């Protein structure tokens, strides 16, 4: 996990900010109820490597630990993750296409 993400998680999940351990404000009664969250990530490998049976396993299953234990825990609605595969080797044209797909996914929220 990147250090910047770990720092964000530590601040968000500080007792009294992201949840309250005394009043048990979590999941359906979380402080962030009514908010939405989307994970956006890139990979260096092809999509096939991140599918069930692929070398790395289903990426969406790996991301569930973040979406469930952080976003859902705080009461957020989890939106589908936006994943860009093979980002390190993409052409400018494909980069522009991926950017348009990402813009569309944001506009469709």
Where do the model's predicted regions map?
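Helix-loop-strand module that forms the ligand-binding subsite of alpha/beta enzymes
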Residues: 1-67
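Glycine-rich phosphate/pyrophosphate-binding loop and the adjoining helix
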Residues: 49-109
């Amino acid at each position: 996990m990147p250090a910047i993400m770990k720092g964000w998680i530590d601040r968000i999940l500080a007792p009294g900010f992201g949840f309250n351990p005394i009043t048990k404000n979590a999941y359906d009664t979380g402080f962030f109820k009514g908010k939405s969250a989307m994970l956006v990530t890139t990979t260096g490998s092809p999509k096939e490597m991140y599918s069930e049976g692929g070398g790395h396993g289903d990426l969406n299953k790996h991301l569930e630990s973040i979406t469930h234990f952080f976003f859902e825990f705080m009461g957020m609605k989890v939106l589908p993750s936006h994943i860009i595969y093979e980002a390190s080797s993409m052409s400018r044209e494909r980069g522009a296409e991926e950017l348009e797909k990402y813009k569309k996914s944001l506009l469709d929220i």
